[in-house]
Amino acid sequence: FDEHLEAARPRGSLVTSEMELFFSLCPCRIFAVTGSDGKTTTTTIISELLKAQGYRVHLGGNIGKPLLCVLPQMKKEDIVVLELSSFQLHSMVCRPNVAVITNLTPNHLDKHKDFQDYIDAKRSVYERQEAEDLLVLNLNDAHSAYYASFARSRVHYFSDSAPVSDGAVCENGVIYRVSGGERREIMRADEVKIPGAHNVQNYLAAFAATDGYVDEETCRRVAMSFAG
């Protein structure tokens, strides 16, 4: 983060960003996705799922279009889906209704003091959430327990190799949503149109994030037809 901007804060200057300003003005629900890998694909999949369910969706952040200019057209019932980088999240105040952290690897360290600084920058995506909000974490990622320890919101997980009590899981080649330990089948993993095990993980994250917004049949239909 720019040292000159940081130095301005103690002198009473208001330091903000386009995205932070958008959060303060946005009238509708917000899904925010961050992580080292898969965030663009996961953000796009979440957007496609919500659109297929009938929501009016605005895609932005690192992808899509600048959203401040379309704020006047946004309605309360719309949904915004954002891809956010660690650089955007550093020192940023935000409270998305649903936050997703896909995974964490030592990326973009040129923009951070060290790996711990990078890890902690991602916490900004959910630290101001409340009990009714949702944080979605990768159960297979070593940093998820650390993130969960700071969460005040509900925490759901996704995994392609271990059982989850709430979230989404792939077991024996079948993808399920899970609520309170009860599984609801969505589809076989080999039915996902975008190839690769990493894209199954991206869909698991998206299915966990959109539970309560998008039904299982719509999830299956999108995953079988969306080409990326």
Question: What is each of the regions a protein language model found here?
Answer:
Residues 1-139, 143-154:
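Phosphate-binding loop of NTP-binding sites
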Residues 112-116, 153-228:
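Adenine nucleotide phosphate-binding catalytic loops in nucleotide-utilizing enzymes
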